[in-house]
Every structure is written in structure tokens, then in C-alpha cells.
């Protein structure tokens, strides 16, 4: 008589496909996953508690290290929260630089996701192409702020530095180049029969389930929910740009793939328009005291990061440090649906599903 026994298997915390220190304890019966339990906290640094002893400007470098693949949006959300509290008006040129930095960062983040996700399921070449284009974006951001990954570029009231001479022209040249490469990506991967068999019908959830789990970003839009804060609750100068919000219909790994690939195209549209509208002169930083004291009260802001809805709550008692600071970290919320998606799945689909959710462990652990 053939008999199988359930087995506990640890995926991580040093597994290459987790792209960070993340442990997944799975119970398997043969090749079927019966139960999956995420174990997080390996990268917890107590960012929110540390912030209570820092001045507002000193908090900005810490946000770089949450979602380190999209540090510009993290920079922005803390600055935006403080600016909301003190009622600060941002110079127009600074707003355009912020949008350019954030959208270039969004493209770079999605390129990392595209390359690593495909590498994890067996396609090596796309990884090399993705990092080739990402390197061009990183070089552009390096020229802008002097850093490649943890930028510390934005400030309460604007940005630290103006764009160097010729930088806008380089960004303008990058847009058609990236569009051409993106078409090549689709030719290489998006119609590949082997790839389609790995992602279509895998990791399905409904719009109702996505909302109940507080999912956001492509993980929400893949179910058909048309919700993007850049459109639905415009911040900065996003209401000046014409772009679409990609949505799916089935809510599987394929829809999540399509949404993110189309988001790259829409980000290129925003970058192109921002370059065309870019003010020829003007300040990049409002007049702000060196030591910022937010008035007593509280504020909550939220913006659209590559991984979803990132929020920042600040409670102030009138001092130069926040009384309480809280981040809504989208990767943490998006991770919560993983046990449901994995239950009953073949173990071969584990990495496809995990990669499709697209978490960053620095953001999960905070």
C-alpha cells in the first residue's frame, strides 16, 4: 500500500528566490502545499521607534531603507506628511523633479521585479536585459542626487539639489530607448508558451478578497479594481499628466505581470510629459527653517508606490521630533494573502506566486 506523509519544509530565510531574509514554513503532502506560514522580522530595525528621537529631516534617510528598490517614493511620503502638517507650498520646479525621480524609480523597481521573477522560474536572459536598462536609470538618479540606491534626495519643502546641466535631455533620450526595449521584452517573454503555462490561472484571487486583505497596487488592480492614488487622489502634480491605469480581470499571476508591464509604459508617458512641461527656471526648495517644528496635531497621507499604497501617519506635540510616526507599508499587507494563495497549490508554483506578489523585505519588516 502506497502511503504519503506530510512534511515540513523551510523555504528561506536564505533562499535566493525570497530576495531577502524571509522564511516560509510550508507543510507539503507529496507535491501539494497543505499549509504555508510566513515568518518575518529578520530585517526589522525599529524605524518608527527610532523616528521618535529624530528631527523630521533626519528621518528621510531611514525611509530609503524600507523599500530600497523604490527609495524615492519613500522619501516623498515622509516629506509630504510633514508638508501637509505645516501647510507648505512646494516650488513648481521641485515638484517636477520629484515626479521624474519617482517615476524613474517606479520603472527601475518594475525592471528588478521583471528580471528576478523570470530568473526564479528559469529564464536567465531577461534578468540580464532588465538590469542593463535599470543601470541606465540608476546612473540618471546618481547624476541627480549622488547615490545609486538609498538616495536621501527629497527634503521637506522640495529637493536637495537641482538637476545638473544636460540631465533633462538625458531623461528625454531614455524614454524612446526604453519603449523600444520594452517591445523587445514582450517579444521575448510575454508570448512565450512555457512562460504562459507557468503564470496563467496560477495564484487567483477575487476583487473582494483583494480588498478584504487590504491589497494595493498591481496586486489589487489585477482583479479589475481601478484604483491608483495618482489618479483617484492626485498628489504633487499628477493631475497635470495624461496616463491610464492598467487593470486585469482574472486576478492571476499573468494579470499581475501584465499590469506591471503596462505600468512601465504609463510611467514613461508621465516622464515624457514631465520633461516637456519642465520649468526652465525656479527654486527647488521652499524657505524652510533648519529645525522644523510641526504644530500640535496629526496628519496622514498616502501615495502610490510601485508596490502599492504607502502611507505615513504623524502625530506631533509641537516639538522638533514626531510624537509618533507610523508607515503603512504595502509589502507587509500584500504578503498577508500568500498563505491563502499557496494552500492547495503544487510546490512548483510557489516561486511563481511569491514573485507575483512582489514584496520587498525591508518594507515588510520596517
UniProtKB/Swiss-Prot annotation:
Question: Which GO MF terms does the UniProt record name?
Answer: NAD binding; NADH:ubiquinone reductase (non-electrogenic) activity; quinone binding
Q: Which SUPFAM superfamilies match?
A: HydB/Nqo4-like
What reaction does this catalyse? a quinone + NADH + 5 H(+)(in) = a quinol + NAD(+) + 4 H(+)(out)
Key words, A-Z: Cell membrane, Membrane, NAD, Quinone, Translocase, Transport
Query: Principal localization?
Result: membrane
The cellular component terms of Gene Ontology attached to this UniProt record, alphabetical and capped at eight, are: plasma membrane
Q: Where in the cell is it found?
A: Cell membrane
Pfam families linked: Complex1_49kDa
Q: Does the keyword field hold Lipid metabolism?
A: no
Looking at the UniProt entry, the stretches that span the membrane are none
> Can the keyword Translocase be found in this entry's annotation?
yes
- InterPro entries reported for this sequence: NADH_Q_OxRdtase_suD, NDH1_su_D/H, NiFe-Hase_large
EC number(s) from the headed UniProt entry = 7.1.1.-
Quote the Gene3D superfamilies the UniProt record gives.
Answer: Cytochrome-c3 Hydrogenase, chain B
Domain of life of the native organism: Bacteria
Membrane topology category: Peripheral membrane protein
| Assembly information from the UniProt record | NDH-1 is composed of 14 different subunits. Subunits NuoB, C, D, E, F, and G constitute the peripheral sector of the complex.
As for what it does, the entry says: NDH-1 shuttles electrons from NADH, via FMN and iron-sulfur (Fe-S) centers, to quinones in the respiratory chain. The immediate electron acceptor for the enzyme in this species is believed to be a menaquinone. Couples the redox reaction to proton translocation (for every two electrons transferred, four hydrogen ions are translocated across the cytoplasmic membrane), and thus conserves the redox energy in a proton gradient.
Family, per the entry? Belongs to the complex I 49 kDa subunit family.
List the HAMAP family. Answer: NDH1_NuoD
Q: Which NCBIfam families does the protein's record reference? A: PRK06075.1, PRK12322.1
Q: What is this protein called?
A: NADH-quinone oxidoreductase subunit D
Amino acid at each position: 500500500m502506497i502511503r504519503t506523509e506530510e512534511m515540513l519544509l523551510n523555504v528561506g530565510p536564505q533562499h535566493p528566490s525570497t530576495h531577502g531574509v524571509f522564511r516560509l514554513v510550508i507543510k507539503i503532502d507529496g507535491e501539494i502545499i497543505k499549509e504555508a506560514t510566513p515568518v518575518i522580522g529578520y530585517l526589522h530595525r525599529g524605524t518608527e521607534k527610532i523616528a521618535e528621537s529624530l528631527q523630521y529631516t533626519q528621518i528621510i534617510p531611514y525611509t530609503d531603507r524600507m523599500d530600497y528598490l523604490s527609495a524615492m517614493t519613500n522619501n516623498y511620503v515622509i516629506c509630504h506628511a510633514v508638508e501637509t502638517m505645516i501647510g507648505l507650498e512646494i516650488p513648481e520646479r521641485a515638484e517636477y523633479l520629484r515626479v521624474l525621480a519617482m517615476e524613474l524609480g517606479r520603472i527601475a523597481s518594475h525592471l528588478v521585479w521583471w528580471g528576478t521573477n523570470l530568473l526564479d522560474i528559469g529564464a536567465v536572459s531577461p534578468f540580464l536585459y532588465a538590469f542593463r536598462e535599470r543601470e541606465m536609470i540608476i546612473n540618471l538618479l546618481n547624476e541627480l542626487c549622488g547615490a545609486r540606491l538609498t538616495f536621501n534626495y527629497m527634503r521637506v519643502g522640495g529637493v536637495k539639489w537641482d538637476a545638473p546641466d544636460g540631465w533633462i535631455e538625458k531623461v528625454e533620450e531614455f524614454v524612446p530607448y526604453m519603449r523600444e526595449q520594452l517591445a523587445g521584452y514582450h517579444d521575448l517573454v510575454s508570448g512565450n508558451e512555457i512562460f504562459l503555462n507557468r503564470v496563467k490561472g496560477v495564484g487567483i484571487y477575487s476583487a473582494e478578497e483583494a480588498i478584504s486583505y487590504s491589497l494595493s497596487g498591481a496586486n489589487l488592480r489585477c482583479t479589475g479594481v481601478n484604483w491608483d492614488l495618482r489618479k483617484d487622489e492626485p498628489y504633487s502634480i499628477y493631475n497635470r499628466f495624461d496616463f491610464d491605469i492598467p487593470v486585469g480581470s482574472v486576478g492571476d499571476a499573468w494579470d499581475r505581470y501584465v499590469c506591471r508591464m503596462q505600468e512601465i509604459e504609463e510611467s514613461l508617458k508621465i516622464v515624457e510629459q514631465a520633461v516637456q512641461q519642465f520649468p526652465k527656471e525656479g527654486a527647488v526648495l521652499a524657505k524652510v527653517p533648519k529645525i522644523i517644528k510641526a504644530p500640535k496635531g496629526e496628519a496622514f497621507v498616502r501615495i502610490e508606490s510601485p508596490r502599492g499604497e504607502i502611507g505615513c501617519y504623524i502625530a506631533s506635540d509641537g516639538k522638533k521630533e514626531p510624537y509618533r510616526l507610523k508607515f503603512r507599508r504595502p509589502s507587509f499587507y500584500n504578503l498577508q494573502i500568500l498563505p491563502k494563495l499557496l494552500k492547495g497549490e503544487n510546490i512548483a508554483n510557489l516561486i511563481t506566486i511569491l514573485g507575483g506578489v512582489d514584496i520587498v523585505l525591508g518594507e515588510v519588516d520596517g
